[in-house]
UniProtKB/Swiss-Prot annotation:
Residues 1-31, 288-320 are annotated as: Disordered. It comes from the Eukaryota. This is Putative uncharacterized protein DDB_G0287573. Residues 1-15 have a biased composition (Basic and acidic residues).
């Protein structure tokens, strides 16, 4: 674009001298041969402006066209050779200072241009050879490309006598497109209907169909006047039947397409809204869960701290009470068993009582040892995992021992009594068994009486303590 713009400016500068010569030639000979000079001058001028338009240098095109219109159609008789507007008076430039582009300009036509063209009162609707057709067409397109469609419409209304509705067909169609672009649907509808009423007989069939198409599909369809447009087509006497049916069918198809698009847009909007709501709900739920987790963690930590602080005290308070209560119970059991021993005369019951007393004494001694250990180690906490492991190991070892004893017993089973082996085994081992039984009875009796004496001495010493 920059290269084209530079090249355009070079073309414009190179041809400026020729243009000035043409202007001088036109001004010197305008009184004698207006028609011939106008044709030669306009042909050269048109070629130059069209080349500039192709290179998209719209600002130069606008200035050239406005100067040409002013020369050809101005009614001010006091103007001499310098009757065309100056370049400085055509545009209003608003400089905007930016960091990136310090000299950006927005182009707009000055009020002097509109005031000068409001005095033209030009009317050439039936004249197909009028030069304003191609000049205004290029001018409207250039102003649209520059971003000033409203200035183009204002210029058309000022230049022609009765406004847009009294313009040639090409200018009318371009003006209606600009109105549709600016979303002025009511104004465009009024202008088309007025032009059709005024000049219906002067339009060709293709021009008339083009205006009807603009009115129905570009204006009334966007105004959502479907029934009115169908009635207008049905009552139109200038259109052929197949053309009417084609327009009506196309109109229904456009309505269906629009309804389908609107439905899709609604579904998309609903989908987006539901997704947003779901995301919001998920975020809220996540936030609530995070808050709950944080609160639970805090509560758990507080409980752990309280438990850690209260466990040693509870153990210090509870363990002595338990041990003391166990010791008192064991003492009672020992006293009862001693009274039983003194009253017993049978050996079997005496053995049972002695065993009970021994077991109670062991429990008392163990509880005393545990008491001393707990008093010395009050600050150390009991590790439940290690205790469970130890208990499990003991159980496993006991199970192994029991399993081994069972195997040994199974291996040392005596033979069957009625068999010859059993009788031989009994005869061989009878003397040995009798001697072993006598020795065991003597040893057990002596051991039991010695244990009883030792038990009585321990109980009396324990009661003293």
């Amino acid at each position: 674009m920059e290269k084209n713009y530079i090249f355009e400016n070079s073309i414009y500068k190179d041809e400026n001298e020729n243009d000035n010569e043409d202007d001088q030639y036109y001004n010197n000979n305008s009184s004698n041969n207006d028609e011939i000079i106008n044709e030669e001058y306009l042909i050269k001028k048109r070629e130059k402006i069209e080349t500039l338009f192709l290179y998209q240098n719209f600002q130069i095109v606008i200035t050239e066209l406005i100067n040409l219109l002013y020369k050809l159609y101005s009614n001010n008789n006091n103007n001499n050779n310098n009757n065309s507007p100056l370049l400085s008076s055509i545009f209003n430039t608003n400089n905007e200072e930016n960091n990136e582009n310090p000299t950006t300009t927005t182009i707009s036509l000055s009020n002097k241009i509109f005031e000068s063209f409001s005095k033209c009162y030009h009317s050439c609707q039936n004249d197909t050879n009028c030069q304003c057709r191609w000049i205004m067409e290029l001018l409207i397109q250039s102003l649209y490309e520059v971003g000033k469609p409203s200035d183009a419409l204002k210029l058309v209304n000022r230049f022609y006598q009765d406004g847009i509705s009294n313009t040639p067909i090409n200018i009318l169609i371009l003006s209606i497109h600009l109105l549709v672009y600016l979303k002025s649907y009511n104004e465009s509808k009024v202008i088309i209907i007025e032009a059709l009423k005024r000049n219906r007989n002067e339009f060709k069939s293709d021009q008339y169909e083009q205006l009807i198409e603009l009115l129905i599909f570009h204006v009334m369809f966007r105004m959502n006047e479907i029934n009115e447009s169908i009635s207008l087509l049905q009552n139109d006497s200038y259109l052929s039947d197949w053309k009417k049916n084609g327009f009506i069918k196309a109109l229904y198809e456009m309505v269906q397409i629009r309804e389908f698009e609107e439905k899709n847009q609604r579904e998309l909007q609903l989908k987006r809204e539901t997704e947003k709501l779901q995301q919001q709900n998920q975020q809220q739920q996540q936030q609530q869960l995070e808050k709950q987790l944080i609160n639970e963690q805090q509560q758990h930590q507080q409980q752990q701290e309280l438990n850690n602080s209260s466990q040693p005290q509870q153990e210090q308070e509870q363990l002595p009470i338990k041990t003391q209560s166990n010791i008192s119970i064991i003492k009672d059991i020992i006293n009862e068993s001693i009274h039983e021993i003194l009253s017993i005369r049978d050996l079997k019951s005496l053995k049972l009582a002695i065993n009970r007393v021994l077991f109670a004494v062991k429990r008392v001694s163990n509880s005393r040892n545990n008491n001393n250990n707990n008093n010395n180690n009050n600050n150390n906490l009991i590790n439940t995992k290690t205790l469970k492991q130890q208990q499990q190991q003991k159980l496993n070892s006991n199970n192994k021992r029991q399993f081994g004893i069972k195997n040994v017993q199974q291996q040392q089973q005596q033979p069957y009594r009625n068999s010859q082996q059993y009788q031989q085994y009994r005869q061989n081992n009878r003397s040995i068994l009798n001697s072993n039984n006598n020795n065991n009875n003597n040893n057990s009796s002596t051991a039991n009486w010695g244990g009883l004496k030792q038990l009585l001495s321990n109980t009396f010493s324990f009661n003293r303590v």
